[in-house]
C-alpha cells in the first residue's frame, strides 16, 4: 500500500503591492497641477538628414586586425607564437604497450 498523508503545502497570503496608507493618499484628489513631462531630447524616428549624419559616423569605425590580435593572444598564453609548433610535429609517442598499468589491488592503498 502507498502512504497517503496530508499535504504540507500552504499558500502564502497575498501581499498588496503598496501599503494601505499610500493607496488612500493616491485616491484623494489633489489641487496641484500635474507636472509637465519634458520632451525627449532625441526622437526615436530620426529625419533623413539625421540618418545621413549617423551613417557618416559609422564609416569612420575601423575594424581591428583580427589576425594580429590572435597572434598576440597566442603569445600571451604560451609565451611563443602559434605558428612555431614545428617542434611538436614529427615526434612519435611511445606505444601504450610499454607502459605498465597497475592492476586492481596493486600499489599503495590510501586510507
UniProtKB/Swiss-Prot annotation:
Superkingdom per UniProt: Eukaryota
Region (Disordered): 1-61, 77-111
Bias type Basic and acidic residues, positions: 86-111
Pfam families xrefs: GAGE
Family named by the database record: Belongs to the GAGE family.
Name of this chain's protein: X antigen family member 2
Species assigned in the record: Homo sapiens (Human)
Amino acid at each position: 500500500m502507498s502512504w497517503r498523508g496530508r499535504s504540507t503545502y500552504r499558500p502564502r497570503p497575498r501581499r498588496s503591492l503598496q501599503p494601505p496608507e499610500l493607496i488612500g493618499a493616491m485616491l484623494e484628489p489633489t489641487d496641484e497641477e500635474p507636472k509637465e513631462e519634458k520632451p525627449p531630447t532625441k526622437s526615436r524616428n530620426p529625419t533623413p538628414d539625421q540618418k545621413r549624419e549617423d551613417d557618416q559616423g559609422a564609416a569612420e569605425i575601423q575594424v581591428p586586425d583580427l589576425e594580429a590580435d590572435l597572434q598576440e593572444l597566442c603569445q600571451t598564453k604560451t609565451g611563443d607564437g602559434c605558428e612555431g609548433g614545428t617542434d611538436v610535429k614529427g615526434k612519435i609517442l611511445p606505444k601504450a604497450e610499454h607502459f605498465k598499468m597497475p592492476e586492481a589491488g596493486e600499489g599503495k592503498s590510501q586510507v
